Amino acid sequence: MRRKAGIRLIGTLTFFAVSCLQGQGEQEKVHSFYGRPLMGILASQIDGDQASGYNKFGYQVGMATGYRLSEKKKFDVIEMQFCMVQRGSRRAFDPLTMVNAFHIKARQIELQVAGIRKVSAGRLGAIDLLGGIRFTRLLKIEESEGYNPGIASDFSQNGLILQFAVGSRVSKVLDLRLHWDYSVLSALSQSASYNLFYPTGVYHNGVGLTALIRFDN
């Protein structure tokens, strides 16, 4: 049921974004909407799970819709993203220390509201600085390499993640963004039992590269 609801919501937002694209001119006009499909790769980890480094590769696929403000505002654009995201963490078996391997996969829907400021970066030209907050809803979490049967009940279904990004237009049809995000709240539920995998609380942490496809110039 959750997966079907998520698919319906993605479809609705996609239809809205495509509708916004109709009638867009060759220049970005203030007080106008835009919509752009996005896809990205994510190197993630879960701080507090006793693994180190960005050890789990994930992804995000979704849609960004935005509204362009006048140049006199603090933000040039207010943008909303709706994405299907896979995060998690992974640790390989170490024969020297005999630590157990695990591979946590968390699939969730994420809705982000962000402000974007366009600034000049010298020879690099204009770049976008983005700061936003992502509201997350956990759809499914599983352990595929270790043994943790209670993992689904240990993790909270709802969460908050901060994201900061730097973006640039690299072609007529493509923007690229390098982003970093971190949980505002622990990803564990309040009723989670003590577990050796995450004794001090866990926080989603990730860096990624996302491409946004332009239909407007």
Where are these regions (language model features)?
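Outer-membrane beta-barrel channels and translocator barrels
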Residues: 30, 68-73, 120-124, 171-173, ...
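Flexible, solvent-exposed loop segments that connect beta-strands
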Residues: 45-53, 86-107, 137-157, 186-202
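Predominantly the C-terminal beta-signal and adjacent terminal strand-loop region
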Residues: 75, 83, 87, 161-217
